[in-house]
């Protein structure tokens, strides 16, 4: 039966495999929305009163539209959905923080690569994407809307 997800269900949905691609909305300089696909990982170590599921972490090149947008305007929204019955989704609104720290960048690029491409390709993905010019982005949730089993 359709129901609103609790925080643990949200975290499990975001971490489930096979990994789903998120749809990230950022704000262009002229105020128009920009939506782009992102691979992400959930950092449960950041769970707390101000982040009940933890931060959503992804990387992007600083020169991309989303990279430029979020360094200027940190408000973001991310939607992750299940496109097969019984259909579920999580939408997260929040604020981004950006880092260019090389160790953090390599770590998260490797984690994300393993999540989407498999453990055997994680290091290669990390080495290719954990480089200067890339950003580590942490989306700290301020609002989460999530429903499970919508077609039941």
Short names for language-model regions:
Residues 1-5, 88-152:
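Charged, gly/pro-rich active-site loop segments
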Residues 10, 66-72, 92, 104-108:
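Amphipathic alpha-helical interface surfaces
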Residues 1-22:
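Extreme N-terminal tail/first-helix region
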Residues 7-8, 63-64, 122:
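Structural motif corresponding to alpha-helix initiation and N-cap regions
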Residues 14-18, 71-72, 130:
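Alpha-helix boundary recognition
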Residues 81-83, 141-142:
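Short secondary-structure boundary segments
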Residues 14, 69-70, 112, 139:
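A generic structural signal for nonpolar/aromatic side chains embedded in well-ordered alpha-helices
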Residues 19-62, 68-70, 76-80, 89-91:
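Short beta-strand segments
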């Amino acid at each position: 039966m359709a129901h609103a997800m609790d925080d643990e269900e949200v975290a499990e949905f975001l971490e489930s495999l096979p990994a789903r691609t998120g749809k990230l909305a950022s704000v262009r300089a002229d105020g128009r929305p920009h939506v782009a696909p992102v691979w992400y990982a959930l950092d449960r170590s950041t769970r707390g009163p101000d982040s009940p599921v933890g931060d959503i972490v992804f990387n992007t090149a600083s020169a991309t539209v989303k990279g430029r947008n979020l360094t200027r305007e940190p408000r973001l929204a991310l939607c992750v959905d299940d496109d097969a019955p019984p259909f579920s989704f999580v939408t997260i609104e929040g604020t981004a923080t950006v880092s260019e720290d090389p160790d953090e960048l390599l770590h998260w690029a490797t984690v994300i690569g393993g999540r989407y491409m498999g453990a055997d390709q994680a290091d290669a993905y990390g080495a290719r994407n954990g480089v200067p010019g890339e950003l580590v982005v942490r989306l700290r949730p301020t609002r989460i809307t999530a429903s499970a089993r919508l077609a039941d």
